[in-house]
Amino acid sequence: FMSPTYLGIPLIAVALTLPWILFPTPSARWLNNRLITLQGWFINRFTQQLLLPLNLGGHKWAALLTSLMLFLITLNMLGLLPYTFTPTTQLSLNMGLAVPLWLATVIIGMRNQPTAALGHLLPEGTPVPLIPVLIIIETISLFIRPLALGVRLTANLTAGHLLIQLIATAAFVLLPLMPTVAILTSIVLFLLTLLEIAVAMIQAYVFVLLLSLYLQENV
């Protein structure tokens, strides 16, 4: 029940404040402050980028995809704090998000346009002898999509956390032995932490972007 601190700042306060930075703040005023304006711009740009290639049927997914990305960013960013656990490093959670959403896009395609959805399994202009082989390959690639979604998110975050842990341990061990090397290692650790923050946000965006691409094929 101890609240650890980082540079004198209680981490529990940072953990409680971070979601409010990401999620939009409702306001009835004509003019908002800079933070609310930045939040609105970020969410609008993200939604526009995702939904631009989709037709009107895919726009129904706007709230779901935007909420999912904010949810993943929140989990990834909070997991970078010391003494915290990152749920998105668990394959079970990522597969629990990837499989139902991927399956929903496939079911929508089969229900609305079954001919076009099944047509994706056989590229146009395929020679007749290769038709059975290509159908099997395309079917396997279709079922691998949710696994690739979940494994990509898990592997990227796990690798970053392991690197941070190893470099931090090396800096701590080298501090009494070789202070100069320890300081250089700490600088590398700081740069890697900045990179991991970027990776945490980019991987959430890539997860949702790939879902929107799967949706684009079936809507």
From Swiss-Prot:
Gene Ontology molecular function, alphabetical: proton channel activity; proton-transporting ATP synthase activity, rotational mechanism
Membrane disposition: Multi-pass membrane protein
UniProt KW Membrane keyword: yes
Pfam family, one: ATP-synt_A
GO terms under biological process: proton motive force-driven ATP synthesis; proton transmembrane transport
GO cellular component: mitochondrial inner membrane; proton-transporting ATP synthase complex
Chain segments annotated as transmembrane: 4-24, 61-81, 90-110, 124-144, 172-192, 194-214
Main function: Subunit a, of the mitochondrial membrane ATP synthase complex (F(1)F(0) ATP synthase or Complex V) that produces ATP from ADP in the presence of a proton gradient across the membrane which is generated by electron transport complexes of the respiratory chain. ATP synthase complex consist of a soluble F(1) head domain - the catalytic core - and a membrane F(1) domain - the membrane proton channel. These two domains are linked by a central stalk rotating inside the F(1) region and a stationary peripheral stalk.
Protein name, as recorded: ATP synthase F(0) complex subunit a
